[in-house]
Each structure stands twice: as structure tokens, then as C-alpha cells.
């Protein structure tokens, strides 16, 4: 009897397991549970240099950097008000710096001529600052603007100086005289001197130190630029007459920044011309309406005519020439 009960129990269990389950509205699907994949967040770099077209930006902790110097992977950059890295000659504060096409400051390149985006720059310091104004490089004259960009295919000083596509000035009388006088002024003066002190140092060079000798013929006063040609000849040969002395002082004055420089062709008492009126041809200088006579001082027949408000001896004027033209 016990054995029969056990068998009946097993049969009931089997029947229960084999009976399909029906819901009120049909079969109910067993839900499938799937795991959602975990997304690892991408970390924002602390420092990031981005290049978009020809623009370079720098981000620090996700924020664009502006008006700051930054060094990245060994290179130094400056990012301006718009966030762009500076390229070429750039003014930062009151100083100019030069950056290459990739925005890298041109460090440790003192004394080198570099080209960035077809512009020439002469690097003056190891921290990437360029030369500005007039300068001489490998015996050639250049001029650079306030950002260090050399003039190319342009003129200066009312066309007297022409700068070629290479940035070098055409080597004519004007450029050669400019370089000669620049070198002498640099040697004879110091930055601490006033303009008048510098002019006096140049005067002393002419009348005492240069070793000039009197000689040569008078220049052709009808030719344009005769005074600059005469000054260059005087400095190169150390020989000249009153026109040479006057023209040389005028060239120094121009280099020092004087603007009103005139050569006076006149006659003063003397016998050199053997003229019956007792006068002879002579040339002296007027700078900012002050009179200077370097040849008279050098020769000793009239000394100390430096910065006079009038010309101190009897004379008459034939013609006044503007040295700046």
C-alpha cells in the first residue's frame, strides 16, 4: 500500500510538470534580462594644443587661454586676445617678438635672418626679439618696422633709399653713406648723450680726429644729391674742401635726427679765388637755424663757429641747398 502511494505521488508530480501554463490572453513570454554596457568617460586633457585650419589655440582644463605666454612640448607660444597663437612679427606689450609659422617663438637665434610668411626678420636677441629701424647685416643696409618686418620692394626717405625683394637696400651713394655714418655715430657717441652732445662729438671727429686733408675740386652743384656724394667721398678718401667738411657734418646731423639741414654756398673774405672784391667761395652749414663752419675751424682761420645764431663774418649767400633732398 505504501509503495502504491509513492508511485501515485511521482505520477502527479510528472503530470504537473508537463501541463502547459496558459494565461488569460495567451502565452506569456519569459522576459530576457540584458546588461547595459558601462561607458567609460573620456577625461579632458589638462593642457591641450589645438590646430584648426591655420589657427592655433591652447586650452587649460578645458578653457581657452588668452593673453598669456605658454610653453608646450618645449616650444614657447603667445596667445592673444582672440586666443590665437601669434605668428610672424607681433607686438606684446611694448616689445616685438617673432614666431614661426607654427607659432613657435624664435628662441636662441640671435643674429640670424629668418623668413616667416614671406616676411624677413633679423633676430636681435635669444628671446626672439627682432631688430627694428635701420640696421646693417652682413654689410647690407636694412630697415624694419616696429614689428621687425623688413621693408621689401619699398622706398624710404623720399625715395633716396630703395629696399629690394631680399630686404637689402640698393647699394647706391645714399645707402653707402647711410651705413658709413651709422657706424661712425655708433662709435663716437653713447645712448646717454643728448642729441646736441652727439652732434658735438661728430664735430670734434671732423675738425680734430678724422685726419682729414684739404684738397680736391668743388662738386658739381647742379647735380641732384651732390652733397651726399661729396660727404661719402670725404669719409672714404679723407680728402675734401669746404664743401666736403660741410656735407660731412650735415650727414652726421641727419643721422642724429635733425630735420632742417641746409648747406650754404656763399662767399667770405679770402684770396683763394683771386677775385678783385677780396672774397672767395666758401660753404658752411645751417642746422635748425644755427650756423656751423667745420672747415674754418679745421683750417684755423675762424674757430668755434658751432651753433651760432648768426654767421659771424662778412659774407654773402649765393644759394642755399636742402641736404634732405
Predicted regions and their residues:
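Active-site neighborhood of thiol-dependent amide/isopeptide-bond enzymes
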Residues: 215-281
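Extracellular adhesion/carbohydrate-binding repeat motifs centered on closely spaced tryptophans
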Residues: 3-180, 218-219, 265-288, 297, ...
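Non-catalytic ligand/cofactor/substrate-binding and regulatory segments of enzyme domains
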Residues: 173-185, 202, 206, 306-325
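Secondary-structure boundary elements
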Residues: 176-234
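Short, basic/low-complexity N-terminal boundary segments at the transition from targeting/disordered tails
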Residues: 121, 258-261, 323
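Solvent-exposed loop/turn segments at secondary-structure junctions
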Residues: 207-213, 240-242, 267-272, 291-292, ...
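Loop/turn elements at helix/coil->beta-strand transitions in domains of secreted/extracellular proteins
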Residues: 195-200, 256-261, 289-290
Amino acid at each position: 500500500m505504501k509503495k502504491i502511494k509513492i508511485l501515485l505521488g511521482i505520477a502527479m508530480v510528472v503530470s504537473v510538470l508537463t501541463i502547459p501554463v496558459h494565461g488569460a490572453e495567451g502565452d506569456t513570454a519569459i522576459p530576457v534580462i540584458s546588461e547595459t554596457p558601462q561607458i567609460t568617460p573620456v577625461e579632458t586633457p589638462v593642457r591641450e594644443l589645438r590646430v584648426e585650419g591655420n589657427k592655433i589655440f591652447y586650452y587649460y582644463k578645458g578653457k581657452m587661454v588668452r593673453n598669456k605666454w605658454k610653453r608646450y612640448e618645449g616650444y614657447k607660444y603667445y596667445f592673444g586676445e582672440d586666443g590665437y597663437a601669434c605668428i610672424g612679427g607681433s607686438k606684446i606689450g611694448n616689445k616685438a617678438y617673432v614666431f614661426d609659422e607654427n607659432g613657435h617663438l624664435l628662441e636662441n637665434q640671435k643674429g640670424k635672418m629668418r623668413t616667416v610668411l614671406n616676411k624677413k626678420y633679423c633676430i636681435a636677441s635669444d628671446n626672439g626679439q627682432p631688430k627694428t629701424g635701420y640696421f646693417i647685416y652682413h654689410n647690407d643696409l636694412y630697415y624694419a618696422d616696429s614689428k621687425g618686418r623688413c621693408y621689401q620692394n619699398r622706398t624710404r626717405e623720399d625715395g633716396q633709399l630703395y629696399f629690394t625683394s631680399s630686404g637689402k637696400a640698393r647699394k647706391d651713394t645714399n645707402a653707402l653713406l647711410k651705413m658709413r655714418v651709422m657706424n661712425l655715430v655708433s662709435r663716437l657717441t653713447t645712448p646717454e648723450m643728448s642729441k646736441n652732445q652727439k652732434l658735438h662729438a661728430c664735430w670734434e671727429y671732423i675738425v680734430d680726429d678724422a685726419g682729414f686733408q684739404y684738397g680736391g675740386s668743388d662738386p658739381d652743384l647742379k647735380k641732384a644729391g651732390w652733397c651726399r656724394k661729396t660727404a661719402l667721398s670725404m669719409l672714404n678718401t679723407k680728402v675734401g674742401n669746404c664743401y666736403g667738411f660741410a656735407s660731412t657734418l650735415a650727414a652726421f646731423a641727419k643721422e642724429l635726427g635733425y630735420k632742417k639741414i641746409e648747406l650754404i654756398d656763399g662767399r667770405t673774405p679770402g684770396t683763394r679765388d683771386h677775385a678783385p672784391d677780396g672774397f672767395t667761395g666758401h660753404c658752411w652749414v645751417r642746422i635748425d637755424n644755427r650756423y656751423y663752419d667745420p672747415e674754418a675751424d679745421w683750417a684755423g682761420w675762424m674757430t668755434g663757429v658751432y651753433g651760432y645764431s648768426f654767421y659771424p663774418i662778412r659774407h654773402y649767400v649765393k644759394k642755399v641747398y636742402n641736404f634732405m633732398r
